[in-house]
Design a protein with these regions (language model features):
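Metal-dependent amide/peptide-bond hydrolase catalytic core
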Residues: 2-5, 164, 171-172, 178-367
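Acidic/His- and Gly-rich active-site-bordering loop/insert found
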Residues: 2-99, 115-123
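Conserved strand-to-helix beginnings and helix N-cap segments that scaffold or border functional pockets
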Residues: 28, 79, 106, 139-144, ...
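A structural signal for isolated positions on well-ordered beta-strands in alpha/beta enzyme cores
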Residues: 66, 127-129, 279
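Acidic-glycine-rich active-site phosphate/pyrophosphate-binding loop
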Residues: 72-90, 156, 171-182, 329
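Glycine/serine-rich anion-binding loops at beta->alpha junctions
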Residues: 93-108, 189
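Acidic/histidine-rich catalytic neighborhood of metal-dependent amide-processing enzymes
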Residues: 107-175, 366
Length: 367
């Protein structure tokens, strides 16, 4: 049975979390350890749903900040337990599966919650959510399940998600739409092409329109979001001497959070301008999240991180909070470029930096 010390140095707590292997669908041990540690806090109300653990303070303060992070990882790649190394510049690096995505962020959040879950310590009531199943299908995502079944637990004036962001705020996120554009023809031998109809050729027009598309950039709360429309897949091969009777483009549209899903769909369909006979199939749709940095509760966080913020281009679970009307940002240590890699790693200085900035932001002494 693993014990966690939530009051430990955040680097040591990160290492302890990394050493509890928790690939998706196998989060029970880490959830057990987190639950036990949180239940030791006198003033925390703790609930568990599957392998998702939620703890809250209820001091009757005027505002609430939600701290959320996932506790599952991608499959192991011979990269546990953790290890520490020094870079050529003398920087200490913590290696291990989940070190950057996102057990370091989770360690910072759990540590801040534990230290401030006492009367008079925090400027806001706090909720911490350690959830399962982020790295797999949505139906397993613990935050999605909370949103569906217990949305009141996600309520707050602002939510922070511990995704790796280089120890700066990555505000909001862009929405995403993935569609299939299907063409249907008649198969024939390429030596007798007049006997068939080449489905791939029917996609030439829409392919050229996508290639010519000029994506927009938009500034929201001083964050610049850059949209993108791209073909990310092509299908239709039968044989090297055969006209394909079916061809498909897989298209991804990343849209700024000032567009609703309906507006993004309408814009996408206008740009694609499909010819008769082509079929449009929506495969995946997810709304974006506005940055919310104009929210008064966010001002203290912006100050605590020295005004360092930028737009989040990818989609993250902050959108789940945004859909409930809760402004949300990504804030965690480390370079997301190391996520999911065998050499996953996180600088220890960034872990301590995020931990200190969180405490500065959330502490009653900072008011």
């Amino acid at each position: 049975m693993t014990s966690l010390d939530l009051f430990a140095d955040p680097v040591d707590l990160t290492a302890a979390l990394v050493d509890i292997e928790s690939p998706s669908h196998h989060e029970e041990a880490i959830a057990d350890a987190i639950e036990r540690a949180l239940r030791d806090l006198e003033h925390a109300e703790v609930q568990r749903f599957g392998n998702t653990v939620v703890a809250r303070t209820n001091f009757g303060l005027d505002s609430r900040v939600v701290l959320a992070g996932h506790i599952d990882t991608v499959p192991l790649a011979d990269n546990t337990p953790h290890r520490l190394t020094s870079s050529l510049t003398g920087e200490t690096i913590l290696h291990g599966c989940g070190s950057v995505d996102m057990k370091s962020g989770m360690a910072c959040y759990l540590g801040a919650f534990a230290r401030l879950a006492q009367p008079g310590k925090a400027a806001h009531d706090l909720t911490v959510i350690a959830y399962e199943g982020e790295e797999v299908a949505t139906k397993y995502n613990g935050l999605y399940l909370l949103e569906r079944d217990h949305s009141e637990l996600l309520e707050g004036d602002i939510a922070l998600l511990g995704e790796p962001s280089g120890a700066m705020i990555e505000a909001g996120c862009q929405g995403t739409i993935r569609v299939f554009v299907d063409a249907h023809g008649t198969r024939a031998h390429s030596a007798r092409a007049w006997l068939g109809h080449n489905a791939a050729h029917d996609l030439a027009g829409v392919l050229s329109r996508i290639a010519a598309y000029e994506p927009r950039s938009v500034l929201i709360d001083d964050c610049e979001y850059r949209e993108g429309l791209n073909v990310v897949g092509l299908e239709g091969f039968v044989a090297t001497n055969t006209l394909p009777d079916h061809a498909r483009l897989i298209v991804n549209f990343r849209f700024a959070p000032d567009r609703s899903v309906e507006e993004a769909k309408a814009h996408l369909e206008e740009v694609l301008a499909l010819e008769d006979g082509l079929e449009l199939i929506y495969d995946d749709v997810a709304a974006g999240a506005l940055p919310g940095l104009g929210n008064p509760v966010a001002a203290g966080l912006v100050k605590a991180v020295g005004g360092n913020f930028r737009a989040k281009f990818g989609w993250t679970d902050v959108a789940r909070f945004s859909s409930l009307g809760v402004p949300a940002v990504n804030f965690g240590p480390g370079d997301p470029g190391y996520a999911h890699k065998p050499e996953e790693q996180c600088p220890v200085d960034e872990i301590r930096q995020v931990s200190a900035q969180l405490l500065e932001y959330l502490s009653a002494e900072s008011e």
